[in-house]
Amino acid sequence: MQNNNPCGLDGFAFLEFSGPDRNKLHQQFSEMGFQAVAHHKNQDITLFKQGEIQFIVNAASHCQAEAHASTHGPGACAMGFKVKDAKAAFQHAIAHGGIAFQDAPHANHGLPAIQAIGGSVIYFVDEEHQPFSHEWNITSPEPVVGNGLTAIDHLTHNVYRGNMDKWASFYASIFNFQEIRFFNIKGKMTGLVSRALGSPCGKIKIPLNESKDDLSQIEEFLHEYHGEGIQHIALNTNDIYKTVNGLRKQGVKFLDVPDTYYEMINDRLPWHKEPLNQLHAEKILIDGEADPKDGLLLQIFTENIFGPVFFEIIQRKGNQGFGEGNFQALFEAIERDQVRRGTLKELS
């Protein structure tokens, strides 16, 4: 393995979810275009696929997934990282501060793993080590197109105030993640700081969010989720208009965006060439730099899907940012949603 990529990282392998009601998770993923392609032979564990995305819904009892659901409610209880050599990556992780994780025997993934944020787990996956590799009953071996979601783009972690350096150090010391973006967002009433980390392979991105006050959406998440964890999951598409339209038809609800946002797009990005009426109709956000060479990014955020967790749909047209130009508009949109739900009082 290369020194700059000591664990031989090569992207996301899977995300694992658990919750008090696994039927709701199954229904939600089906509405998003995922298909159940395999079931565990002996446990209540289901594998969903769409494009290259693999979601595992783990409803087994007396295991880490159940414990995570008991603490946090529905959410992402584990993530799998693709690596060149799972055993070597695990050994490197342990030598650099990682804490080994071993699940209950009946729910063992058959993968080396370490403890991660908020009681979650990071599994190491290679060609030899696959999750529950010999325990699946395959029901659908065909590729699943679904709503055109293709891959996991990034996972955003919400952390307690004062813990950003701790988790940045965790990813840096074990995996050699580097800071690739830093944001300081101020809404009308609340604020947050975000530090985006990127893996040496360039395929894993993990922004860390930390609140600047007691009332922000980050603090609301930490309170409702009963701790730190994965706040949102960003999924790639090659045609965001088609994907979002399909998701809306299947009942997925997205954050509203003020009409004034679309009145400003041509001034912000005069070169963009996107169909403005379609952007407006689907409430899709657009971002880019002054120089067209840096490309565009199209994105949209769902409302909270289960608990305080939500999804982002993103299409990258050459831009590798996170929609920094949209953060302010999005932050204020979420503040409006907080006011509507009564968790934040509007300033008079």
Swiss-Prot record:
This is 4-hydroxyphenylpyruvate dioxygenase. Fe cation binds at residues 154, 232, 312. It catalyses: 3-(4-hydroxyphenyl)pyruvate + O2 = homogentisate + CO2. Catalyzes the transformation of p-hydroxyphenylpyruvate into HGA. Has hemolytic and brown pigment production activity. Its EC number is 1.13.11.27. One of its GO terms (biological process) is tyrosine catabolic process. It comes from the Bacteria.
